[in-house]
Amino acid sequence: MEKREDGGILTYDGRYVMYNVLGNIFELSSKYIPPIEPIGRGAYGIVCCATNSETNEEVAIKKIANAFDNRVDAKRTLREIKLLSHMDHDNVIKIKDIIELPEKERFEDVYIVYELMDTDLHQIIRSTQTLTDDHCQYFLYQILRGLKYIHSANVLHRDLKPSNLVLNTNCDLKICDFGLARTSNETEIMTEYVVTRWYRAPELLLNSSEYTGAIDIWSVGCIFMEILRRETLFPGKDYVQQLKLITELLGSPDDSDLDFLRSDNARKYVKQLPHVQKQSFREKFPNISPMALDLAEKMLVFDPSKRITVDEALKQPYLASLHEINEEPTCPTPFSFDFEETALDEQDIKELVWRESLHFKNM
């Protein structure tokens, strides 16, 4: 194996180069050139930046090591790839490439190449950077604009949180991480771990099996308040405290707010919680603009059927200076989750991811 000056080791007759990044091996097609630097890590693995020498474009490359070792994680990877390949919107992250090695037998690690962004909303909220009302409006507008497109494709994101909203230095925002997304006409109860607790809608906390795009709107309401306040709105330590924090602000739900709960146990549980009055948003948050609070309050409604929709949210006065119906496209065709319906094992999923990677060969 020939070693290059930049530390890379040539493989497959120089068509691929192997780099060591913080002890992680990245084996990339040779068009991706250094500097190869780590820019983030998550439960799935590590993300690096590199440059595509053919387009001169900087990209982010996520390595999912041993991607097919277990079925749940493998399906999550397949779902993310299929969904993002289907979508094409300014406020949804784009997949640029999937790097696969020439030998299918060695296809164990998946490298997904995305457009490169500079930061995420979690980091911005936690920073000392001043956020004006214009910033807050623009962030919220882009989240809703992207979500309108996602919901129009019959997709629920289900894991919206500040760290899944990435930005560049122009404040352009894109929604990422679709590994937990589902179709909006699916009724099966979600079994796997979904949505960071702090952004989880009441119907999910109470295990309702019927959920809609309203779960994403709740998350957006929590994120919006976090942008405005620079701190988490409902930082529950567990499910019980999460519901308690929600009812302390919104007040105890009355019977008509619990129609969405099919389970008698869930209804009983909510009814036995201490009865509390709704707090006035304007009194509790006097430093936030009334128009912003009015919109947040319409998103943060206990009963999902009474929660504002993404289309209604875009028409609210707070976003009047940005809202332009003709500039808020929908997805031309709904996304099909058919591949979820067959009983796929790890090898089947591997084959499907391999096929997805071939689509990028001719691009």
Swiss-Prot record:
GO terms for molecular function: ATP binding; MAP kinase activity; protein serine kinase activity. Disruption phenotype: RNAi MPK13 displays fewer lateral roots. Expressed in roots, stems and flower buds. ATP binds at residues 39-47, 62. Pfam families: Pkinase (PF00069). Residues 33-319 form the Protein kinase domain. A motif (TXY) lies at residues 191-193. The modification Phosphothreonine is found at residues 191, 196. InterPro entries: Kinase-like_dom_sf (IPR011009), MAP_kinase (IPR050117), MAP_kinase_CS (IPR003527), Prot_kinase_dom (IPR000719), Protein_kinase_ATP_BS (IPR017441), Ser/Thr_kinase_AS (IPR008271). The keyword Nucleotide-binding applies. Its EC number is 2.7.11.24. The modification Phosphotyrosine is found at residue 193. It catalyses: L-seryl-[protein] + ATP = O-phospho-L-seryl-[protein] + ADP + H(+); L-threonyl-[protein] + ATP = O-phospho-L-threonyl-[protein] + ADP + H(+). The active site is at residue 159. Keywords: ATP-binding, Kinase, Nucleotide-binding, Phosphoprotein, Serine/threonine-protein kinase, Transferase. Activated by threonine and tyrosine phosphorylation. Activated by the MAP kinase kinase MKK6 in vitro. Dually phosphorylated on Thr-191 and Tyr-193, which activates the enzyme. It is an enzyme of class 2 (transferase). MKK6-MPK13 module positively regulates lateral root formation. Belongs to the protein kinase superfamily. CMGC Ser/Thr protein kinase family. MAP kinase subfamily. Interacts with MKK6. The TXY motif contains the threonine and tyrosine residues whose phosphorylation activates the MAP kinases. PANTHER family: MITOGEN-ACTIVATED PROTEIN KINASE (PTHR24055). This is Mitogen-activated protein kinase 13.
